[in-house]
């Protein structure tokens, strides 16, 4: 029997501790819904600016959104963006998950000031190890060349552009 964490089982939380969703209950010939979110951002002229993909089940969408925010709004490189700490809010349960630091994976983690502030405004917080999501990214630079980056959370992950 094969196992897929993408299917939901009634009254059983998934690998991330999230409640099951009826749309993903196991049924004959059923395919699970997916959070897969390969993303392409284009320049106004239609050429590719960013190509990005992520793995991580329920946490994919928040990883993609954070990567785009870091690159588009904060002007980070793809490698800098992928190395940033991540947070995830599934809405149910009512908890925001923050990555903690990992020197081995070259991830800083969220600082105590950020998480203390969230807690002070009534947010339930929890900490997770880096690596619950991983991603790869490609970005076209202004001179027409590309930068590619692999997630430091994955052992031997890298990007290479010619």
Predicted feature descriptions by range:
Residues 1-6, 68, 154-162:
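Extended active-site and interfacial segments that coordinate phosphate-rich ligands
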Residues 71-121, 125:
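Compact, glycine/acidic-enriched structural inserts
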Residues 109-162:
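In a subset of proteins, long, contiguous C-terminal domains/tails are tracked
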Residues 33-36, 63, 133:
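Short, solvent-exposed loop/turn segments at the edges of secondary structure
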Residues 1-44, 74, 78:
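Active-site rim segments in enzyme catalytic domains, especially the processed small/beta chain
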Residues 40, 64, 81, 138:
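Hydrophobic, well-ordered secondary-structure elements that form the walls
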Residues 42, 48-55:
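Short, well-ordered beta-strand elements
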Residues 53-76:
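Alpha-helical support elements that line or immediately flank enzyme active sites
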